[in-house]
Design a protein with these regions (language model features):
Chain B
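Catalytic alpha-helical scaffold of carbohydrate-active enzymes acting on polysaccharides/glycoconjugates
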Residues: 2-198, 223-248, 254-312
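A conserved mid-domain beta-alpha-beta active-site/ligand-binding segment of alpha/beta enzyme cores
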Residues: 201-234
Length: 307, 312
């Protein structure tokens, strides 16, 4: 008998997410005495100016003129072309930086991008250590109002397009705008995915249960994400770099107390790939690669390591 | 059939493109785009400069108008000191109604980039014939009041457009469109017919309105961003040989404020400190690209596309 009677229409906890708390769970042991596993996920999403009828779109999203996050009027090209910058220039700058630093990366592609941008998928497949499926387009999202079959079809279409275009098998998923229905994790597992990166819920991977059993939530942090830090929060880029440095330093220190830590760096071609911000990525990855306490690993490998 | 915005882009990833180069071995072209704007006191349709009160909004009308009465002239002193060629993103009503401002720009040889008639008269949903007449009027204004020089490009008023904008710009003799910020180089834009139109990289990154007015960074951050952006482009160009473009977008009512002068001068001094930087106008950059790169870039991108279709 509990004291709280939750309203019938409330879902109090995320389905599939076991409740577990630091200092009350066995520490996560990383190989070779490493203290911090870091995965870099580079987003290469495309923006569909006129989504198909019936698509679900975000209420607000970043990119465009000023700080207005509402959907731009048709005919304004700022958001469309700013997101496209990630595909023409930004993602390649970030891939070059990672390659020079010797850091393995996963690149997340969507079906609209690989269908409409000739050469994008081939070149990413040559340069990325892991391919991740990122839905239909940056601004076509999963939504609770979809039926299960609609959501299954969305997931299947995206996966099929990205795998066909890259010639690579994808074991990981990232939802545009991190938008989910309550069913999403279970449907991703049903579709055969091993991990997904949507949930910034922990500092170590989380094995899900219930319908999503077998799926690992690889937590790509929100506060350390470039779009959230530089756009949503409007941090100045030197402050963002300091935030990253201090996060790494603290996570390594915490590992001695609560066990191995994970840091998922979620970076967008159209954000950190901008020339004015790219040195933050370069310096951060160079420092991480030189840190003997850090294990640099793709998210697919970190999910496998955790299982 | 109207070309959709996504389809206007001629995609090719930067690493596979033929090299784009700039005159005299320079590697980063930088254009200064002062937005000299007029905002109607009471705008057709009732728009306001800031969306703060119902019209009129004297606070922001006056704030912007002061940009042309005082701040513009202060900015000119910095432009003159560093001899910065400028491409004015111009509310074209200024040509007819502010001869002092017009003549100061003309004396310095500033290039006019259309920014509409007023910055509170966007193009959204404008019928084809009305938009057609808008470009006709734009060119008439330039020919009448600016030494017969026709306008070569546009940044849509209030960054607006329609599905017909690119095609109508070509019809009226324009060659560059600044609303696209999808690249560090000009890129071909698909249009109906054989007209050649390119995107010219404008900026909402190195732009005083998003940085200072919308996001409230200090003036010194505008300098930090400009230096970070151009430094990185210079290093990348040294490495891969690709010429790049940066834009410094200013507005008199923002960058012309007294406290901003030192930062504007710091940016201009930086532009003059490195011989690899080509300080040019949007038309200089566009003309050079059309002459030397456009056909090769288009053919190369089309080749990649054709190879993919053949493989499929």
């Amino acid at each position: 008998m509990t004291l709280i009677q939750h309203p019938r229409d409330a879902t109090v906890f995320a389905p599939g997410l076991p409740r577990a708390y630091d200092t009350h769970r066995a520490p996560w042991q990383l190989p070779a005495g490493k203290k911090l596993a870091v995965s870099v996920l580079l987003h290469a999403p495309s923006y569909q100016d006129v989504p198909p009828a019936g698509s679900f779109k975000p209420i607000a999203m970043q990119g465009g003129v000023g700080r207005d996050t509402a959907e731009p009027k048709h005919g304004q090209l700022a958001r469309l072309s700013q997101w496209d910058f990630g595909l023409t220039v930004g993602i390649w700058r970030l891939l070059g930086i990672a390659q020079k630093a010797g850091v393995p990366v996963a690149v997340a592609l969507d079906s609209f991008g690989v269908r409409t941008m000739p050469g994008l998928a081939d070149l990413v497949a040559e340069r990325a250590q892991e391919i991740v499926v990122r839905g239909s387009a940056a601004n076509i999202i999963l939504d609770e109002a979809m039926t299960a079959d609609e959501e299954r079809a969305y997931i299947a279409e995206a996966r099929s397009a990205v795998e066909a275009a890259t010639g690579r098998t994808a074991s990981g998923w990232f939802s545009p705008e991190r938008a989910n229905s309550a069913r999403t994790a279970g449907l991703l597992r049903e579709a055969g995915f091993d991990w997904f990166g949507d949930w910034p819920v922990d500092e170590r991977p989380v094995a899900l249960d219930g319908a999503a059993s077998g799926l690992t939530a690889v937590p790509f942090g929100l506060e350390t994400e470039d779009m959230f830090a530089l756009y949503t929060r409007s941090l100045a880029f030197p402050d963002y770099e300091r935030l990253l440095d201090e996060t790494v330093e603290q996570l390594i220190a915490d590992a001695d107390v609560v066990g191995g830590r994970f840091l998922g760096l979620s970076w967008f071609g159209w954000v950190l790939g901008q020339a004015c911000f790219a040195d933050v990525a370069e310096r951060t990855l160079t420092k991480l690669a030189a840190n003997p306490q850090v294990l640099l690993v793709t998210p697919g490998d970190v999910a496998a390591l955790h299982r | 059939m109207t070309i959709q915005n996504n389809d206007r882009l001629v995609y090719e990833a930067m690493p596979t493109r033929p090299l784009v180069t700039w005159p005299e071995g320079r590697t980063v072209a930088v254009w200064h785009a002062p937005n000299v704007e007029h905002y109607d006191y009471i705008a057709p349709g009732g728009g306001t400069p800031q969306g703060r009160t119902r019209y009129p909004d004297p606070q922001h009308y006056m704030h912007r108008d002061n940009g042309n009465r005082t701040a513009f002239w202060r900015m000119l002193r910095a432009v003159d000191r560093f001899e910065i060629p400028s491409t004015v993103s111009l509310s074209l009503s200024v040509l007819e109604e502010m001869p002092e401002v017009r003549d100061a720009m003309a004396e310095r040889g500033w290039e006019i980039m259309s920014h509409g008639i007023s910055n509170l008269r966007p193009l959204y949903d404008m019928p084809y014939d009305d938009e057609d007449r808008f470009y006709e009027l734009s060119q008439q204004l330039a020919e009448t009041y600016y030494g017969g020089r026709r306008i070569k490009g546009m940044l849509g008023p209030k960054v607006s457009g329609t599905d017909n904008t690119s095609d109508l710009m070509v019809k009226h003799g324009m060659t560059y469109h600044a609303d696209w910020i999808h690249d560090e180089q000009p890129r071909p834009l698909r249009t109906e017919g054989d007209g050649r139109l390119v995107s010219i990289p404008y900026s909402f990154m190195l732009n005083d309105v998003p940085l200072l007015l919308a996001k409230h960074y200090p003036g010194s951050y505008f300098v930090d961003m400009a230096k970070a952006q151009i430094d990185r482009m210079l290093r990348d160009a040294d490495e891969d040989g690709q010429g790049r473009v940066a834009c410094i977008a200013t507005h008199p009512f923002v960058s012309g404020q007294p406290y901003m002068q030192r930062y504007l001068e710091e940016i201009f001094a930086y532009l003059r400190s490195d011989d690899r930087i080509w300080v040019a106008t949007a038309a200089d950059i566009t003309d050079h690209y059309l002459e030397n790169s456009y056909d090769e870039q288009l053919a190369h991108a089309n080749g990649i596309s054709a190879a993919r279709e053949a493989r499929a």
